């Protein structure tokens, strides 16, 4: 039996986090949920996720700064990172892309099924 793919869900809004957590768990993923950038960096090393679903606007350390640190840390530099954010301006997308994000999804422009499909795509799974 193949082990579950591990997703690190980084979202400071607890309602949004619980919705994404529940749906991804239903899809068969093993989920670890954290609520700020500091927790995200620690969990990325401890949990060893297959993919990080990362909010941009968070307390303590922004998602952009988390992404920058992940990409400059040997143990995490190759992790797949999908940014899921309310920030819809091109400058924000370009900033994330310059930092090495694998995908950038704007919350107001996607439904949860789209998020699941993008996660599966980046993990090489059938959609």
Model regions: which residues?
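The feature encodes the CheY-like receiver
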Residues: 59, 77, 89
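Acidic, metal-coordinating helix/loop segments flanking the phosphotransfer/catalytic sites
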Residues: 33-51
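Active-site residues of response regulator receiver
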Residues: 55, 85
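Non-catalytic signal-transmission and effector/linker regions of two-component phosphorelay proteins
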Residues: 1-6, 113-127
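Conserved acidic carboxylate
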Residues: 11
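Two-component/phosphorelay signaling modules centered on CheY-like receiver
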Residues: 14-32
């Amino acid at each position: 039996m193949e082990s579950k793919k591990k997703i690190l869900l980084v979202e400071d809004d607890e309602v949004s986090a619980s919705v994404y957590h529940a749906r991804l768990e239903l899809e068969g993923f093993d989920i670890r949920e954290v609520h700020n950038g500091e927790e995200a960096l620690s969990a990325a090393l401890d949990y060893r996720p297959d993919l990080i679903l990362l909010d941009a606007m968070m307390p303590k350390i922004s998602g952009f700064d988390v992404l920058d640190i992940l990409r400059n840390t040997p143990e995490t530099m190759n992790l797949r990172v999908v940014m899921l954010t309310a920030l819809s301006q091109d400058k924000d997308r370009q900033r994330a892309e310059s930092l090495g994000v694998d995908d950038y999804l704007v919350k107001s422009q996607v439904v949860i099924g789209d998020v699941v499909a993008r996660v599966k795509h980046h993990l090489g799974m059938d959609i």
